[in-house]
Amino acid sequence: MFDIRAIRDNPDAFRNAWNRRKSGLGSVVDDILKLDAQWREATTAKQDAESARNANSKLIGQAKAKKDEAEAARLMALVAEAKTTMEQAGEAEDNARKALDDLLMGLPNLPLDEVPEGSDEHGNVEQHTWGEPKLINDPKDHADLGEALKGQGGFPMMDFEAAARMSGARFVALRGKLTRLERALANFMLDLQTTEHGYEEMSVPVLVRDQALYGTGQLPKFAEDLFRTTVDHWLTPTAEVSLTNLVREQILDAAQLPLRFTAHTPCFRSEAGSAGRDTKGMIRQHQFNKVELVSIVANEAEGLAELERMTGCAEEVLKRLELPFRRMLLCTGDMGAGARKTYDLEVWLPSQNTYREISSCSYCGDFQARRMDARYRPEPKAKPEYVHTLNGSGLAVGRTLVAVLENYQNADGSITVPKALVPYMGGVEVIN
């Protein structure tokens, strides 16, 4: 949600910002101003009618005291007319306000000026790379590697067929040592983020109500990307939703900031716009696990510094696992709707001979805070101001598993366990 006064006072700034997103939304500013004018006009009409009703109501008593029944009758007619006008104007006010709020709730955030302008991923800008991709002769992809590894009864450790029989496409069942490797990755990530990077581990709901998704910006525009369970509950597409909503409708003290949360949860996405993309393997699943990072800070300066810190925390996971990666600054047309600035981390996948996204870290400004009414007091008795929020993957566990399998594969099909994970694997150094 945006401050309508800010749009009213500087419409060109909003028009230009939405035009930079290449979303075709620049003209929406005119629609906003039109609805705003209708709402203010109706509000004024209702207030004027209320004032007329109150004034004439007082005069009725005076007319009756003077036994001027004709004047009293005239005034009562005016009061009745004012009540009708109030009802009509009130209805018009409510309708205009609802239409205005609905329009504002569906609009994306404003990109920062420093974000490069572009229409899609081709406009993203590489910031740096880390590590050298390993030279692997005839690398196999993770799906082939996982299916070739056998668990009990000779069943594949990465079993897409079993998952499909119970759930359909874009699901997987992991067995044996691959299951342990997935758990090891999640525990390693959580330990790193909590013991070294200052994040507080949380256990949060993965079923949330409409208002939680409105707060973080997935609703109303992206409902088709979500799984709905009941009339008012949805499965979370990311723990960002639950972690960010921890400060919903709260007024924090400045001394409490920054807040840093992390959680390991299953995530659920319909992948409505991904038909035909990454249909094989674990890259794009309806259900996957992720370690999420969320930060709550006071203002833009702190938010931009926190974005660098958060992205570095995510990068450290890849460094400890010795997985080559690069950091990309996303352009205006490729950023998520709630972001003002986003870095993507992309990990090297030998089978594809390219980098693939494994983490996305975003600074959202006060975009989510306004929708959640999350505020803080800069001073003990100061007027509350909106907090600023950030979120990032630290990391997507399934995609990290994919990267480990592909980058640590051996010629015989076995997988060397990264040194950082050996303690989490009970000393197991090779999966075969």
From Swiss-Prot:
Pathway recorded for this protein: Aminoacyl-tRNA biosynthesis; selenocysteinyl-tRNA(Sec) biosynthesis; L-seryl-tRNA(Sec) from L-serine and tRNA(Sec): step 1/1
Any one Gene Ontology cellular component term annotated for this protein: cytoplasm
Keywords of the record: Aminoacyl-tRNA synthetase, ATP-binding, Cytoplasm, Ligase, Nucleotide-binding, Protein biosynthesis
GO molecular function, one term: ATP binding
PROSITE patterns: AA_TRNA_LIGASE_II
GO BP terms: selenocysteine biosynthetic process; seryl-tRNA aminoacylation
Reaction catalysed by this enzyme: tRNA(Ser) + L-serine + ATP = L-seryl-tRNA(Ser) + AMP + diphosphate + H(+); tRNA(Sec) + L-serine + ATP = L-seryl-tRNA(Sec) + AMP + diphosphate + H(+)
Main location: cytoplasm
Keyword Cell inner membrane: no
EC category: ligase
Coiled coil regions in record: none
Binding site for ATP: R269, S270, E271, E357, I358, S359, S360
This enzyme's EC code(s): 6.1.1.11
Subcellular location: Cytoplasm
Family: Belongs to the class-II aminoacyl-tRNA synthetase family. Type-1 seryl-tRNA synthetase subfamily.
Oligomer status and interactors: Homodimer. The tRNA molecule binds across the dimer.
Recorded domain comment: Consists of two distinct domains, a catalytic core and a N-terminal extension that is involved in tRNA binding.
NCBIfam families: serS
The protein's name in its UniProt record: Serine--tRNA ligase
Organism: Hyphomonas neptunium (strain ATCC 15444)
Source taxonomy: Bacteria, Pseudomonadati, Pseudomonadota, Alphaproteobacteria, Hyphomonadales
